[in-house]
C-alpha cells in the first residue's frame, strides 16, 4: 500500500471536513472553503479530528489514488487553516509589477502592458515593483497562477532577465565569443 496513503490527516481545530455522495469532499476553515471530487477507488472516514483514506481494493490504481487523495486532502486542510504563499521575482531593466484589486499589471518589455486577471480565491501583493507575493487557500490554483505569470517572460539563460520563482536557480550561459 502507498506509504503516503497510510498516514492519517490530522484536522486542526476550526477545520471541518464533510464527505458527500460521490466522494465529494468539502473542507471548511477560517480562510476559505474548498471542495473537490475524488476517485471512487478510495473511501474517506473522519473521526476524532483525524481523516483516513483507504483504497477500496488492492489494485495498483486504487493504492495510487489513496496516496494522491491523502496528499490533496492534507493540502486542502493546510490551505483553509493557514493558507499558501508563492513569491515571484522580476529581474530586468524596466520590468515592473503592480497589483490593482483583482488584477496584476505587468510591464515586461513588451510594447504593451500585460494585465493578468487573478482568479477568485487568489490575492496578489507587490511590496516592491520587482516582487510579487501570491496568496490563496488552494495550492493547485496558486501554483497554476504563478506558472501562468512566469510564462509571460521566462528567465533567459544569458542575463537572467524575466519572471522567476523566488527560490528558482537559473543556470547562466556564457555568450559566444568571436
Curated annotation (Swiss-Prot):
Domain of life: Bacteria
Protein name: Large ribosomal subunit protein uL6
Pfam (any one): Ribosomal_L6
Subunit structure: Part of the 50S ribosomal subunit.
Gene Ontology CC entries for this record: cytosolic large ribosomal subunit
Matching SUPFAM superfamilies: Ribosomal protein L6
GO MF terms, alphabetically ordered: rRNA binding; structural constituent of ribosome
Biological process according to GO: cytoplasmic translation
Family per similarity comment: Belongs to the universal ribosomal protein uL6 family.
Function description: This protein binds to the 23S rRNA, and is important in its secondary structure. It is located near the subunit interface in the base of the L7/L12 stalk, and near the tRNA binding site of the peptidyltransferase center.
Keyword annotations of the record: Ribonucleoprotein, Ribosomal protein, RNA-binding, rRNA-binding
InterPro entries xref list: Ribosomal_uL6-like, Ribosomal_uL6-like_a/b-dom_sf, Ribosomal_uL6_a/b-dom, Ribosomal_uL6_bac-type, Ribosomal_uL6_CS
